[in-house]
Amino acid sequence: MSYILSRKSYADMFGVTTGDKITLGDTNLLVRVEKDLTVYGEECKFGGGKVLRDGMGQASGYKSDDVLDLLITNALIIDYTGIYKADIGIKNGHIKAIGKSGNPHIMPGVHPDMIAGTVTEVIAGEGMIITAGGIDNHIHYICPQQMNEALASGITTFIGGGTGPATGTKATTCTPGAFHIEMMLKATDNIPMNIGFLGKGNTSHPEEIEEQIKAGALGLKLHEDWGTTPAAIDNCLSVAEKYDVQVCIHTDTLNESGFVESSRAAFKGRTIHTYHTEGAGGGHAPDIIVLCGDPDVLPSSTNPTKPFTVNTIDEHLDMLMVCHHLDRNIPEDVSFAESRIRGETIAAEDILHDMGALSMLSSDSQAMGRVGEVICRTWQTAHKMKEQRGLLEEDKQIDADNFRVKRYIAKYTINPAIAHGCSHVIGSVEVGKLADLVVWQPDFFGSRPELILKGGVIVQAQMGDPNASIPTPQPFFSRPMFGAMGKATGATSLAFVSAASEETVNGYGLNKKVTPVVGCRSVKKKDMKLNDFLPDIKVDAETYKVTVNGEWITCAPAKKLPLAQLYNLF
């Protein structure tokens, strides 16, 4: 006779199942479990007196090649692909299968690629949330300590440019020239993070750009501080088309060499990733935001303006002065700074994210951005939008926020991967991809990851006093783990480069796997998962009011946010 468990008892023992609702952190966001791929009564669970023992849930007689290296049991997966419960099987650093694991000799429904055997390690996923590792695709490589901070927040991939705290790097995301590209690839080789570097694209001569692509740049960056003229834009995109790499752009705030229409004309329908498309981070004032409606533009935000709060405008003026080498004693510099900070467009940016018109969210690390807050600010924005706009139409039938949550998680996982030609190996919880995974307690979702895995190996974890008798006594905080040490970093992380540079970069002697980017020139806004809305956007040049398809959009700044002082003293 079957034994009947209450939903609460089942969730306490095996984690949530189909139809259950979970609150994310201290936000107002609720998700409902869409499906459960495990088998009731045959769940795998590790521990004394539990299922994963020899001859029970753990199978005997299988070769190592036929069983999993790592099994995450009964996990709630939150991904752009869905919000569902499953076991996750990992083999050779990649996601081998997602479904029901265990011992096929005695358990029904075991996936043939999810056999738990003698060589299988286990992470208990019951009561936990699993997401893909985050991708920050607007990195100023100013200091290596950024990577420790970002990794602890759940970011596992950096894409950007720089050479350290040089004046150019503090302002622009460029790693200029073959020498610097090689040195930066070598310098980051022992850090457990997937890495990619953008070469400098500001020139009207193709040869200087081609040299950087062949040296290992995964893409190119056009920045106004180096002169983002229509000629430079056209030339850079022409070279990118030849070598199948992405171009990122910070357009001309001062409109010296042209207006937003001039840059749009220079694009000539070719794909381009527009950084901080609202404009506070830089770009044609006051209407760079209109590019969110273009089919060839992949628009992203940086996190200082997300979400719009009562402090946003004041802190931006100070940030601008420092990051762009401006002088408060020069009136023109002050005017330059003030032209970029507009409450009206910042307010509209929140709503455009909620509509799916802005496709990605990144940091702008130490250059008007906080590298450890991409994930928490994404969920703060989602919370603020639910508070101000209510349930999305797509979510009303289930009375939960599944669609909104999938839309927002796509902004820092799959969409940056697609934009930069990396989605074949990272960016989502899908079979075949590198097992870059983040494990969260629901109470701490968006703020404090419990475990971070790179290539199926734990690289960071919440850990107590190393001298204690158990792992949990205070001080309890995020610490590097074995996967972040020695040669393990190379075995579990990727160095993203252009296809044209693969042979050259293999000669650099890197430990990380050299991985060419693919499909950068064919991607369009329509390919941005759950964030492909193409509105007709206009900005009033006098009032800065933003209209979408003829309707004025705005929202009030937040006075209080979740995932903030409840979780952080400082």
From Swiss-Prot:
GO biological process, one term: urea catabolic process
GO molecular-function terms, A-Z: nickel cation binding; urease activity
Residues involved in substrate binding: 223
CDD domains cross-referenced by the UniProt entry: Urease_alpha
Keywords tagged on the record: Cytoplasm, Hydrolase, Metal-binding, Nickel
Reactions the enzyme catalyzes: urea + 2 H2O + H(+) = hydrogencarbonate + 2 NH4(+)
Binding site for Ni(2+) 1: 138, 140, 221, 364
Listed PROSITE patterns: UREASE_1, UREASE_2, UREASE_3
Residues reported in the UniProt entry to bind Ni(2+) 2: 221, 250, 276
Pathway given in the UniProt record: Nitrogen metabolism; urea degradation; CO(2) and NH(3) from urea (urease route): step 1/1
Main subcellular localisation: cytoplasm
Domain Urease: 133-570
Location of this chain's protein in the cell: Cytoplasm
EC number: 3.5.1.5
Modification sites for N6-carboxylysine: 221
Co-factor(s): Ni cation
Cofactor: binding details: Binds 2 nickel ions per subunit.
Superkingdom of the organism of origin: Bacteria
UniProt record similarity statement: Belongs to the metallo-dependent hydrolases superfamily. Urease alpha subunit family.
Protein name according to UniProt: Urease subunit alpha
Species this chain originates from: Cytophaga hutchinsonii (strain ATCC 33406 / DSM 1761 / CIP 103989 / NBRC 15051 / NCIMB 9469 / D465)
Gene: ureC
